[in-house]
Amino acid sequence: MKFNATLRSVQGTSASRRLRRAGRVPAIVYGGTAAPLNIELDHNEIFHALRKEQFHASILTMALEGGANEQVLLRSVQWHPFKQQVLHVDFQRVDANQALHTKVPLHFVNAETSPAVKLSGAIISHVVTEVEVTCLPQSLPQFIEVDLGNLLGGGSIHQKDIVLPKGVTFTHPNDEQVIVSAVVKGGAADDAEEAPAA
């Protein structure tokens, strides 16, 4: 994805307030061998971009007005506590030859055809919806697919069951980390609670 940016010459709290009143968002680009770069963004453009999952989990192209394009990764977003307003954005430069660590969303497929749902009427509980991975920029997936097609009622899928794309590893490997569980409605515990006291 691509977004537009302009160099920000004036800094400080009051300058940032003026920018926001003018429909702009202060931001910074850091990392790599170059000095940090203070930029400003169009609020509406960045607001709508942030609503797309792809903007959070892919290498972005920053088109700097009057300068060269740069490859960056979204690192953090500061939102207004109660308004739909972006206050500040942090980006990190991307080096094609240097591994990066970032979070990638999980996409769950085939839940409706799994034995857990079809045969047991289970409720699928998504315990984890994103994972942190390590890879070179060119190997960064926009998402990682988790196939629930063989999930049984009362069963679960762990981190070790996830098939990662080539060149991608978990930043914090934990084979027993539960990703998804299939919770069967009712069950012995509920039956015991509903039974009248002797």
Swiss-Prot record:
Assigned GO CC terms: cytosolic large ribosomal subunit
> Which CDD domains is this protein grouped with?
Ribosomal_L25_TL5_CTC (cd00495)
User: Which InterPro entries did the record assign?
Assistant: Rbsml_bL25/Gln-tRNA_synth_N, Ribosomal_bL25/Gln-tRNA_synth, Ribosomal_bL25_b-dom, Ribosomal_bL25_C, Ribosomal_bL25_long, Ribosomal_bL25_short, Ribosomal_L25_dom, Ribosomal_uL5_bac-type
* Signal sequence range: none
List, in alphabetical order, the Gene Ontology terms for molecular function in this entry.
5S rRNA binding; structural constituent of ribosome
**Keyword annotations:** Ribonucleoprotein, Ribosomal protein, RNA-binding, rRNA-binding
Statement: the UniProt record of this protein carries the keyword Ribonucleoprotein: yes
> Any keyword Ribosomal protein?
yes
Name the Gene Ontology biological process terms: translation
Checking HAMAP family in the record gives:
Ribosomal_bL25, Ribosomal_bL25_CTC
Protein role? This is one of the proteins that binds to the 5S RNA in the ribosome where it forms part of the central protuberance.
Q: How does it assemble?
A: Part of the 50S ribosomal subunit; part of the 5S rRNA/L5/L18/L25 subcomplex. Contacts the 5S rRNA. Binds to the 5S rRNA independently of L5 and L18.
Q: Which family does it belong to?
A: Belongs to the bacterial ribosomal protein bL25 family. CTC subfamily.
Record's protein name: Large ribosomal subunit protein bL25
